Design a protein with these regions (language model features):
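Short hinge/gating elements
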Residues: 48-51, 412-413
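A generic structural-conservation signal
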Residues: 77, 200, 331, 391, ...
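Membrane-embedded transmembrane helical bundles of large multi-pass transporters/channels
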Residues: 1-47, 144-409, 510, 519-724
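Structured non-transmembrane domains adjacent to transmembrane bundles in polytopic membrane proteins
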Residues: 57-76, 86-181, 406-588, 610
Length: 724
């Protein structure tokens, strides 16, 4: 490990390991907690979940939105109330619909407009379908761009108020609220419940795992409290970062606590494992924690730094939601790492060895590391036939990766909920009597109005266009046409229509026309996400390779590690795609999932490989590559496996949430971590290192061989040591 990391570790060890300074460390963290804690509760308020907020400024749909500034319908979103009866609406139904309309205009509109600065416009007469079975009431809602948070609640509160007027409808008459405002209300309701649910689920799981791992009724409190402080601090600083302009979405807000709990607990496991070993060697707990910090801090700093660097590559993304996850996630890892290297060891020192009751580590006793025997047997089994092992594991990973044939990116705003929410049910009712795109028309903005008629005719002939509105809305930026599509405006089929509409309009008006609206925004978002994949994936690999090369002082070993993690990634994505299609029956995969999964699995997979290979390199210096690999795997197996189970468990808690995208992210990363823990790190990496031999350390001096000590060369035995 680099000398600079060791120097930093030595400096860190003096604070939480000091007889007086340990209390100062705890006091500083408590001050930070009380200062930042109140901001943590505001973290959800800083989240943005409108696709238009994620797009780069040069996206055509964003330019169209900017061009509409000053139009009568600027900043307007509709709440569409859909009524439907199989066989046709009755006279009683139509009378009830008129009563609902009157209630919206008199009670809902009057009450909301009196309390907020936004505007709920008058709801016009119902639009009846040609078959007489479906009716629509459209309620325009306008929220000024600079409106307060109270005014912005119009988009969520108005649909809820309208729903309250639907309780007394005639039997058999179905009614739901949909449209952009309806989808917004459902999304906000789901995202508002995410953070509390996720925090409870993640915290409960980590608590349970800590109790099982340490088999102590009290010791779990120390690492759990340390991780909880890191999580609260991260959320508070996350609010400040979001307030400074970094985009935080509900998705990244859901991932953040999982990342902090998982990584923080992993680092805690490594620290506690070494501290417990040192308590068996040293009577003074202060000496024990200082040695433990000196030996584990460089590895934790190196692995955490690698994860931070990988996450920061997300900052290069065009999609601001993805770019925002970079600094937010990196900050979470940094705080978790800092907490586990400061307040955790300080609390461990204050508590002393009695905190481990009933399994108290005493000086001179043997280490209670029963799994070392099992992991030594695994290591020696790999060493007896490394070629057989790496060929077999690659074959298994290839079979898992074959699930990629089920990969599709059909998950959209319209089907992102795991449960049938009102807006989705309303869309289904709407499609029974109207073109599917009536829910959210596509906007065509013509800046040169002399070309308006030509654009209208060209767009009307474009594939997938049901109709172009006869009304023309005019404003400072030109004129706007509303285009209704044949497809659900939030479906991939509708997204695929946008290029044809743009081409048809541009053939007539050139640069004087822009196509926007919800469907175009989703299309542009997917295009930007694809661009982000092409840019960030190779950059992340190069960054991780350079860090590994510096840490291991080699080129071959980092290439081997990166290759194995890439295999692990494709295997995890393949397993995920298979389960999403054939077991969970999800409509598709989130387009952002491959990039998120890649960055997280590369970062976290390399994380565990650093834990392993740092020890292997250390052992190789004395025992040679073969014996060093066996020793390294044997003495790190138990703690890294525990860490992998904790991290996989924390990511699996995302599955409790009602959003398909977060469930997919949690499942894929959890599977990937388990693959990396039990297959890649335990079998594939050691087998490849043993197969390659000393050249794996090229171009360092180790590539020329560093044989074992003479006494071990003579006996052929490999002496086991406690983990360091």
């Amino acid at each position: 490990m680099n000398q600079s990391l060791r120097n930093l570790a030595g400096s860190l060890a003096q604070l939480p390991g000091g007889r007086r300074t340990k209390f100062a460390v705890i006091a500083v963290w408590l001050v930070v907690l009380f200062a930042i804690g109140p901001l943590a509760g505001k973290f959800e308020d800083a989240q943005e979940n409108d696709p238009a907020d994620y797009l780069p400024a040069n996206a055509e749909s964003v330019q169209a939105l900017d061009q509409l500034d000053g139009f009568p319908s600027d900043d307007e979103a509709d709440a569409i109330t859909v009524f439907h009866r199989d066989g046709g609406l009755t006279a009683e139904d139509r009378a009830a619909i008129e009563q609902v309309r009157a209630a919206i205009n008199d009670e809902v509109r009057g009450e909301i407009n009196a309390e907020r600065s936004g505007t709920v416009a008058e709801t016009g007469p119902p639009l009846i379908s040609s078959d007489g079975a479906t009716a629509l009431l459209t309620t325009p809602i306008t929220v000024p761009e600079a409106a307060s948070g109270d005014a912005e609640d119009l988009l969520t509160d108005t649909p809820e108020e309208i729903k309250a007027e639907l309780d007394s409808l005639p039997s058999g008459l179905e009614a739901e609220v949909t449209g952009p405002a309806g989808f917004s209300a459902d999304a906000v309701e789901v995202f508002n419940d995410i953070n509390g649910t996720l925090l409870l689920a993640t915290g409960a799981l980590v608590l349970l795992l800590l109790i099982v791992i340490y088999r102590s009724p009290i010791f779990w409190i120390i690492p759990f409290f340390s991780v909880l402080i890191a999580e609260v601090t991260t959320r508070g600083l996350g609010y400040l970062i979001a307030d400074a302009g970094v985009t935080v979405t509900g998705q990244s807000g859901g991932i953040l606590p999982v990342l902090v709990f998982g990584a923080g607990t992993d680092y805690a496991l490594l620290m506690v494992s070494r501290y417990r070993e040192e308590l068996r060697r040293r009577e003074d707990k202060h000496d024990a924690i200082r040695v433990a910090l000196n030996r584990t801090s460089p590895v934790i700093l190196a692995s955490g730094g690698t994860v931070i660097a990988a996450l920061l590559t997300l900052s290069l993304a065009e999609v601001s939601g993805t770019a925002g996850l970079g600094p937010i996630g990196a900050m979470g890892i940094a705080i978790a790492m800092l907490a586990m290297l400061t307040i955790l060891p300080a609390l461990l020192t204050v508590a002393g060895r009695k905190a481990f009751w009933p399994f108290i580590p005493r000086v001179g006793t043997e280490g209670a590391d029963e799994t070392h025997g099992a992991w030594r047997r695994v290591a020696e089994w790999v060493a007896r036939g490394p070629r057989r092992v790496w060929i077999g594991t690659i074959a298994v990973l290839a079979v898992m990766a074959a699930g990629l044939v089920f990969l599709n990116s059909d998950l959209t705003t319209g089907n992102m909920f795991r449960d049938d929410v009102d807006s989705v049910q309303g869309q289904e009712l709407l499609e029974a009597g109207f073109p599917a795109g009536a829910n959210a028309p596509t906007n065509v903005v013509v800046t040169d109005t002399s070309k308006l008629d030509g654009v209208r005719e060209a767009v009307a002939e474009a594939p997938g266009v049901a109709e172009v509105s006869p009304e023309v809305e005019r404003g400072p930026g030109g004129a706007k046409l509303e285009v209704t599509l044949d497809e659900d405006p939030y479906s991939t089929a509708a997204f695929d229509l946008i290029p044809g509409i743009r081409q048809a309009a541009e053939e007539v008006a050139g640069d004087d026309v822009l196509v926007g609206g919800p469907t175009a925004e989703e299309y542009d978002l997917r295009q930007s996400a694809a661009r982000d994949n092409r840019l960030i994936v190779p950059i992340a690999l190069v960054v991780v390779f350079l860090i590994l090369a510096a840490l291991l002082r080699a080129i071959v070993a980092p290439l081997v590690l990166i290759a194995t993690v890439i295999l692990s990634y494709f295997a995890a994505l393949g397993v995920g795609a298979f389960f999403f299609e054939n077991v969970f029956d999800f409509p598709g995969m989130d387009p952002a999932l491959p990039l998120f999964a890649f960055v997280f699995l590369v970062a976290l997979g390399i994380d565990y490989n650093i834990f392993l290979m740092a020890r292997v390199r250390e052992e190789t210096l004395t025992h040679g590559t073969r014996d060093g690999t066996i020793r390294g795997l044997a003495v790190t197996g138990a703690v890294i496996t525990s860490a992998g189970l904790v991290l996989a468990g924390t990511f699996s808690t995302l599955a409790v949430l009602p959003l398909v995208s977060l469930t997919e992210i949690g499942f894929t990363i959890a599977v990937g971590v388990l693959i990396d823990t039990f297959i890649v790190r335990s079998l594939l990496v050691p087998a490849l290192v043993l197969e390659i031999g000393d050249p794996v350390w090229w171009p360092s001096a180790l590539a020329r061989g560093a044989g074992p000590r003479p006494d071990e060369r003579a006996t052929g035995r490999i002496a086991m040591e406690p983990e360091s």
